[in-house]
Regions:
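Gly/Thr-rich phosphate-binding beta-strand-loop-beta motif of the actin/hexokinase/Hsp70
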Residues: 2-23, 111
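Nucleic-acid-processing active sites and adjacent nucleic-acid-binding tracks
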Residues: 26-60
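Short, solvent-exposed helix-loop connector elements
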Residues: 52, 123-137, 163-166, 258-261, ...
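Acidic, metal-coordinating catalytic cores used for nucleic-acid/nucleotide bond scission
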Residues: 62-72
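Long, charge-rich intrinsically disordered scaffolds of nucleic-acid metabolism proteins
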Residues: 75, 85, 89-208
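Phosphate-backbone recognition surface of nucleic-acid-processing proteins
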Residues: 207, 211, 217, 221-298, ...
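Low-complexity, acidic/Ser/Thr- and charged residue-rich accessory regions of DNA metabolism proteins
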Residues: 254-255, 292-335
């Protein structure tokens, strides 16, 4: 592990970045300055650090994952080939212990301190490839359109409770809006398929994932997005934890013996897609169907068995990616 001499904590907001610099040999001293959350502002951070004669190759930048507001900083630090660490906000919050009040300067300092104290947990971050960034944005827009379609679709429920003259006022406008949204939805899905098709590596991954029973087109795309093209996770167990399907023990001393259960801190979209995939798999995959029925007959709860199937789907997906060969159902060859 690299021995860093300087730690930079950055609190990100929409318009500005609060930057706090801590030196490894004098952690009781810190410097604070503010820049705009733009490419120009981020480059000024680099300039100010250089003016202070700071070795950027021995500097670790640390900041919270704030979604789209994080992109400019991640992109610029990647271009300068500098080390940075993106940490979940809840992890930093819980590491602070009891605290009273907050402001951006204090938050930036807490982030810098987190990187100093938890250097043994360091896992350097990297920006996803351009195609995966595009897929993520398109997938998010598709989700918005799907939710909007659902909202506008409920308007027809009013038809049975009001007169035709009254309903006609909104029905025509509603129909035009729904038609427009469906066109937008089709365009988004077409563009996503086009991006997959034009990238040989993503196309191969997509086809391999689709070969697994229970995994549809949208699930396959989200697997690629969530794993950053299967570069963000080393194995299926880590991804199962990320997806909220890995079981954990809950016990303490001799009296607390909670059941083994999953944790709610997870990618809820991935978990939802896996749930739908598990329900489809027990209908169309004879092996998983038999497994589900067997466990149910043993008295296991439905959700427990379905969660096991979600984990099996993840294992299968990672297996086909690692082998680079499609999933083959050997169950039908068993005697």
């Amino acid at each position: 592990m690299k021995n860093y001499l300087f730690y930079v904590g950055i609190d990100i907001s929409k318009l500005k970045l609060d930057v706090v610099l801590i030196e490894n040999v004098a952690t009781n001293k810190s410097e604070h300055f503010i820049v705009e959350n733009t490419s120009k502002g981020i480059k000024s951070i680099i300039s100010q650090l250089k003016k202070k004669k700071i070795d950027l190759n021995k500097t670790l930048f640390c900041f919270e994952n704030t979604g789209v507001y994080t992109y400019p900083l991640s992109i610029n630090l990647s271009e300068f080939e500098l080390d940075y660490w993106i940490v979940p906000a809840i992890e930093i919050k819980r590491s602070k212990g009891i605290s009273r009040g907050k402001n951006d300067k204090t938050d930036a300092k807490d982030i810098a301190w987190y990187s100093v104290r938890n250097i043994d947990k360091l896992k350097l971050s990297s920006i996803a490839e351009k195609e995966i960034q595009q897929l993520k944005l398109l997938f998010t827009e598709r989700e918005k359109v799907m939710k909007t379609l659902l909202v506008f679709g409920t308007t027809k429920e009013n038809k049975d409770f009001i007169t035709n003259d009254v309903f006609k006022v909104v029905s025509t406008i509603n129909a035009k809006t729904i038609k427009s949204l469906k066109i937008s939805l089709k365009e988004l899905e077409t563009k996503m398929k086009e991006i997959i098709k034009n990238n040989s590596e993503l196309k191969q991954q997509f086809d391999l994932i689709r070969s697994v029973p229970g995994v549809g087109q949208q699930s396959a795309m989200y697997f690629i997005i969530a794993t950053k093209g299967f570069k963000a996770f080393d194995n299926s167990r880590k991804f199962a934890c990320y997806s909220g399907t890995a079981p954990f023990e809950y016990s303490s001393g001799s009296s607390v013996r909670g059941g083994t259960k999953v944790n709610h801190m997870a990618d809820k979209k991935m978990k939802s897609l896996l749930q739908m995939g598990a329900l489809a798999a027990i209908k169309h995959d004879p092996q998983l169907k038999e497994y589900y029925n067997k466990k149910k007959n043993e008295g296991k709860k439905s959700m427990l068995v379905l969660n096991n199937i979600r984990c099996k789907i993840i294992d299968r997906v990672f297996s086909v990616i690692n082998r680079k060969t499609p999933y083959i159902n050997t169950y039908k060859f068993a005697s």
